[in-house]
A protein has these predicted regions:
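Basic, polyanion-binding surface patches
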Residues: 1-181
Length: 181
């Protein structure tokens, strides 16, 4: 079960650099894609880089909204799969066993199996980043996290709270449960 997180703590869901699953709802179709480049730039503002050639890029550009879903380590297969096929060609929710659930503030769905969610609306006027990607700045409209996994920050001693981190190619790491002394 998810609990609502105050927006002033929304940045703490992705401040440590986890891989995210970005969901959209565009022209009557839901979609999900893997995003490694998402970061907070303020308590309730995020920056997300999406390849300009992706179906998800068009969906975000046209609808102005998305959800950043934070997967736990148990979703590595879905993370890899959603990053390897186009949502234009298939229903990735069905193909990779993900459950769409209604978001509170945007039309894009949340992913039930994910441990955290940031519902976002694009701030108009984003600029090109290099030639192949676009940077979207978005305001977080709602934030939620799985009960028991987050206090003032992620409870990394809890194995289910350990997030995935992209190391390059198909290599991923998992957030450790050890805290520095």
């Amino acid at each position: 079960m998810k609990k609502t997180l105050p927006l002033e703590h929304a940045y703490r869901l992705i401040n440590h650099g986890p891989v995210t699953l970005l969901t959209t709802h565009y022209r009557g179709r839901r979609n999900v894609c893997t995003i490694a480049w998402a970061m907070p730039v303020d308590a309730a503002v995020v920056a997300v880089v999406v390849s300009a050639g992706n179906y998800s890029f068009r969906a975000v550009r046209e609808t102005g909204e998305f959800v950043l879903n934070i997967p736990g380590r148990g979703l590595l297969g879905a993370v890899l799969g959603c990053g390897s096929v186009s949502g234009e060609a298939c229903d990735k929710f069905r193909r990779f066993g993900l459950t769409p659930i209604k978001a509170r503030k945007v039309k894009a769905p949340r992913i039930a199996e994910c441990i955290g969610h940031l519902e976002c609306r694009v701030i108009p006027g984003h600029g090109k980043l290099a030639r192949e990607h676009d940077l979207f700045l978005a305001r977080v409209e709602a934030a939620a996290v799985e009960r028991g996994l987050f206090g003032a920050q992620w409870k990394i001693d809890e194995p289910r709270a350990r997030t995935l981190h992209h190391l390059g190619g198909t290599a991923f790491g998992v957030l450790s449960g050890r805290r520095p002394r």
